[in-house]
Amino acid sequence: MNNEELRALNQKRKIYQIAWVTRDLEKSMKAWVDNLKIGPWTVLTFTNQSLKYLKVDDKTVTEPFKFLIGISWIGDMQLELIEPVYGPTIYEAFIQKHGEGLHHIKERIADDAIEGVVQGYRDKGIGVTQTGQFETDFHYYLDTEPKVDFILELGNCPILQLTPDKFSTYPSENA
């Protein structure tokens, strides 16, 4: 692929999210609000009850798991903070290996293209370390870290219309 073709290809791509892992979601959200004026944060809890499925290293997770996420926006860029609570996830494994910090960037891929894109990466020897689905939102974390020193996540990135019982907001309106 020449440079012109590479530029044309990348003009069509969309980096949707940048994400960090943390041991304490509330402490991290507070720090981002207080120091960076980034917020409010939509807070969600993911468990074996709320996800349709979760696979780590191509194996379906059958034991209980829980992780918390906070989502905020700067312009059209989604920022995500993730706190692993228990159970097998790549988030806990990352913290054990690297500590807290930048975890991944996420590229938006159309629903009808995702399987082909994932297969294209598999054909290059880049596997999937974790995949799951919440409502209509699905994600694939690719094993890109050994090749490019960061994790690439692929997902369809739909705008979900969640009922108030499925999320909270930080800081609360009453804070």
State where each predicted segment sits.
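Vicinal oxygen chelate
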Residues: 2-10, 16-21, 39, 43-80, 84-113, 115-175, ...
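Residues within well-ordered alpha-helices
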Residues: 28-29, 68, 117
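Conserved active-site tyrosine of GNAT-family acetyltransferases
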Residues: 31-33, 121
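Mid-sequence acidic-hydrophobic segments that form the walls
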Residues: 88, 108, 112, 120, ...
